[in-house]
Amino acid sequence: MVVGLDQLAALDLSLWMGSGAAAAGLLGVNQSTVSRQQRSALGLLGVSVVSSRGEVRLRGDVELLWAEREVHQMARLRGFAPLRIDANYASGPWFLGTVPEGWIAGRFALPGLQRPMGLLRERVLDAWVCSYQPDLPNADDPDWWVLDLLQAPLQVLASPQHPLAGERRLSQSDLERFPSLALPDGWFPSTEAHLRQQGLWRNAVEFHRYDPDDWEGRSHDGVTLLYGNSLTEALMPCTARLDWDLQLICGDALVVRRDLADQPAIQQLAAFLLARARAIAERFADVQPIH
């Protein structure tokens, strides 16, 4: 181990959380300590930090860094430092409102699939929970272990003051009269294709970290349509369900690297999340646990 656990944690948590201040809060130290440890890690690893579009990234030869991260991840799995988990905005409050012992959790703000799965691939994150089925890797993917937790029908949501709120027997032409939110092309290809076939997913929203103003907050204009299920509806009381069947089942899942799936700490996490899934499903008629 070339770099100490605290030194590399200061660097990688800054990359994960987006700032040294956020990393300091997660580590329970002051920002100057994080900055000092980060500088030390960068010097030992021979890389530098650059900021781009609100994200902190590394520049230089990262071969030694990747080797160190693998060693450090094994140390975390053996209990020498806290393991790291994050979730998307819809899954985090339900599954990680109480963080399991031995883990620290992010802010449930990482966007899309590419960024969080990149952090998993690079061993900055150890586990991720998200509500992005059917767009997650297949069960036989050689790189990823995906444990399905819950499933529920996806719904069209809008402001309670929307002209279609409370109306029955809506048609596709009714929906097409109004703007409908879309994420960047290719973020969720299966979901995108399905919704586009129904005249939805037309007005692109781009963000680098989840902000409610950039998603459910868009419905405050009284006309914009968005999407969710019973879990997201409970988190977004500013929305109402429209009478339209999207004929799409979405789902929450745990995602980890395939080579970590059999680690005891990961299996303990899986058991914790499966128990949470069963408890969550009991609260909603249309939410089903997978196991």
Which residues does each PLM region occupy?
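Secondary-structure junction motif
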Residues: F95, E176-G199, A285
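Short beta-strand-centered segments that line the small-molecule binding cleft or hinge
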Residues: Q114-L154
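Flexible hinge/capping segments at coil-to-helix
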Residues: L147-L154, A158-S180
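A late-sequence structural motif
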Residues: D243-Q288
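N-terminal hydrophobic or amphipathic helices and topogenic motifs
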Residues: M1-P111, A275-H291
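Short helices/loops that flank or line small-molecule/ion binding pockets
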Residues: L26-L27, L113-W128, D211-V223
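Hydrophobic hinge/microswitch elements
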Residues: G186-R241
